[in-house]
Amino acid sequence: MSTPVVVVSTVTHGERSPGVAILSDVSLSAMAGEVVVIEGRSGSGKSTLCQLVAGLEAPDRGTVTVGGSPAASVRDWARLALLPQRLGLPAELTVAENVTLPCWVRGMPARPDLLEAFDLAHLADRRTGEASRGEQQRMAIARAAVLGPDVIVLDEPTSHQDEAHADLVAHQLLELARAGSAVLVATHDPRLVAEADQVVHLHAGRHHHP
């Protein structure tokens, strides 16, 4: 029997207000090749859960593991990659340089196919600071995907996309899953909700089972 690549076990974390946690007793798991959508209203804890799975924080209680290791100890972009809401792309680099940065760090060939896949090839030599918010969001997704990570965590990946590019992003995330990545997405996007293997509903920081 296959082992989940992501396991969130009875996690309680943060403080929404005095004595009230941002996340309370949340559990989920994801297999390689699965798309897991994390859904909920603003303030329900989606972004906090993404940060925990991406290893940016360790949970106050409970455990979060990626490939059997605590998520907070994983520092390998090929194992665990993140698209945060705040993209943090170096503005002085070109679009192509930003997308391929993880390849350079590892001494690997560039991935011009990803520029094509995310409709960025025509912008390859443009400075990132000159790109639109939607273009920068697609750049950040492509950069997160460039090493084919075991797990990719994305916080609202279509929030700055028009309809056509939202379709494109959803398609590429499904392709990542087909290639074997576990794809965890915090989103309201009906395209991804419809295609998800699992939908985790958060309500006031708790996993709500409709």
Name what the model sees in each region:
Residues 148:
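Conserved catalytic motifs of ABC-family nucleotide-binding domains
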Residues 86, 93-105:
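Q-loop/switch helix immediately C-terminal to the Walker
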Residues 69-81, 105:
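ABC ATPase NBD coupling module
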Residues 108-123:
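Conserved ABC ATPase "signature" region
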Residues 152-156:
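Catalytic Walker B motif of ABC-type/P-loop ATPase nucleotide-binding domains
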Residues 127-131, 135:
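Conserved ABC ATPase signature
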Residues 54:
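Helix-to-loop junction immediately C-terminal to a conserved catalytic motif
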